[in-house]
């Protein structure tokens, strides 16, 4: 039996490995490095809205990848869940997003060159 963090790590690794092969990998890496800090500073809903509004496919790809790792269809569904969540659910979702985002950050540092 694996922990939730282990499952997220495996899925994040696969997503980042795929992103490392594609166009926009530098932008994907940059956003992966910034996302945990952005969530801590601006809050979950604002951070997700920022990623969605950037207009760059690599940023949206990261948002969608993060959402899928956490069991959501895409970034917009994750953002909707954050907007509609009660306080305790919102705090839990924030912790989950931060935990998964840290895996994306680490794997982006390791797999995507600057």
Swiss-Prot record:
Keywords: Antiviral defense, Cytoplasm, Plasmid. The keyword Cytoplasm applies. Disulfide bonds: none annotated. Pfam families: Cas_Cmr5. One of its GO terms (cellular component) is cytoplasm. GO terms for biological process: defense response to virus. Gene3D superfamilies: AF1862-like domain (1.10.520.30). CDD domains: Cmr5_III-B. It is found in: Cytoplasm. It comes from the Bacteria. CRISPR (clustered regularly interspaced short palindromic repeat), is an adaptive immune system that provides protection against mobile genetic elements (viruses, transposable elements and conjugative plasmids). CRISPR clusters contain sequences complementary to antecedent mobile elements and target invading nucleic acids. CRISPR clusters are transcribed and processed into CRISPR RNA (crRNA). Part of the Cmr ribonucleoprotein complex. Belongs to the CRISPR system Cmr5 family. Homotrimer. This is CRISPR system Cmr subunit Cmr5. It comes from Thermus thermophilus (strain ATCC 27634 / DSM 579 / HB8). The lineage of its organism: Bacteria, Thermotogati, Deinococcota, Deinococci, Thermales. The gene is cmr5.
